[in-house]
Amino acid sequence: MVKIYIENYGCARNRADGEIMAALLHLAGHEIVYDPDEGEIVVVNSCAVKDPTERKIARRIKELLDSGKKVIVTGCLPHVNPDVIDERVSGILGVKSIDRIIQAVEYALRGEKLISVPDWRKRNLDKLDFPRLSPRTVYFIVPIAEGCLNACTYCATRFARGVLKSYSPEKIVGWVKWAIKQGYKEIWLSAEDTGCYGFDIGTNLAKLLDEITAIEGEFRVRVGMMNPNHVLKFLDELIEAYQDEKIYKFLHLPVQSGDNDILRRMGRNYTVEEFEEIVKEFRKKFPDLNLHTDIIVGFPGEDDEAFQRSVELIRRIRPDKVNVSRYSPRPGTIAAKWKQLPGWIVKERSRLLHRIRLQISYEINQKYIGKKVEVLIHGEGKKGNVDAVTMNYKHVILPFGNSGEFRIAEIKNATSTYLLGEVMS
């Protein structure tokens, strides 16, 4: 038997895949270690959503191989751009082949190489049927679906994850109940797009949330990213479900651009006005809503006027956080074939929007100073402090506190990225 380290990249959905592989390897008698130096085999569970991430992972694989480690590559990269994977690796598994991880390790130990990257149409796994080996943290990731219903012209993730496959509400609820019995206090509902959950099996996210919040116990639910075009189909029902106190008043709603022509080129299937309508309705019901959104700058065809509309949108809706991404062409996507903007323009726009979003975040967070808020303590942070989150998922740094406790904290200071508080006696 062998010591194995699993290095996860990317989304929560991918981390859950890593926990499945860890459980399968553990049950097969292998030792899962949490320091890469201890691992005889390193599983690099990759992400391919952006070019910089891809290059970082490729460098990391080379570094591990040069240090004498055996490396097995899993995740989205084998589907999206296998050519960047060092040929010296000991195995390659796609996202639909993670159940073959034991076999891949056996091959590697014999000096052989297992490659299994099936098309998502040819092999389907219900990943809620597999065991999990999760870190003993406060939160537990529950995947609710794999794949999506969009066809964005810039996205290569769909080549790996495929079309939407929603997991049954019964299995999801079963995992949530299990996690709560194990002592987890926070449930992350994860998918490529939680907004389209259930559309393929005759249900939706709001109905699922109602089932989850009906479970007994003191816990909170963090809902993952949802696309506006799907939310529009059941907006009132979703807002109603969000009223339960167990659901964090946190909304990750990516807009990607403030220009309708660019949204059409992206294949996003909604307008800026529809995005703003969702935000308005949520804020009407939840004034303290923690709104996160995403913006891609430098998309092909984005002129100065289109970019300015994105800037104006962010200034108008004032999200708590904006994830600003510089567009990078991904292999096999439609947008990669279009005329690209000069890199210096993309960089300049990214820096400008980043400065604006930091200022907005700072101004919003300053308004929390002096407030007393309920927090869930996550555990030890940096410099001897502890990390916590409010009931709208604002990050708070506290001087002390026990992991998994719900406490009242008074906010004493704030930056653009977190709040600083004191635990009330």
Swiss-Prot record:
Name under which the protein is recorded: Probable threonylcarbamoyladenosine tRNA methylthiotransferase
Entry similarity comment: Belongs to the methylthiotransferase family. CDKAL1 subfamily.
Keyword list, A-Z: 4Fe-4S, Iron, Iron-sulfur, Metal-binding, S-adenosyl-L-methionine, Transferase, tRNA processing
Co-factor requirement: [4Fe-4S] cluster
Organism whose genome encodes this protein: Pyrococcus abyssi (strain GE5 / Orsay)
E.C. no: 2.8.4.5
Top-tier EC class: transferase
Catalytic activity: N(6)-L-threonylcarbamoyladenosine(37) in tRNA + (sulfur carrier)-SH + AH2 + 2 S-adenosyl-L-methionine = 2-methylsulfanyl-N(6)-L-threonylcarbamoyladenosine(37) in tRNA + (sulfur carrier)-H + 5'-deoxyadenosine + L-methionine + A + S-adenosyl-L-homocysteine + 2 H(+)
Domain of life of the native organism: Archaea
Residues annotated for [4Fe-4S] cluster 1 binding in this entry: 11, 47, 76
GO MF, one annotated term: N6-threonylcarbomyladenosine methylthiotransferase activity
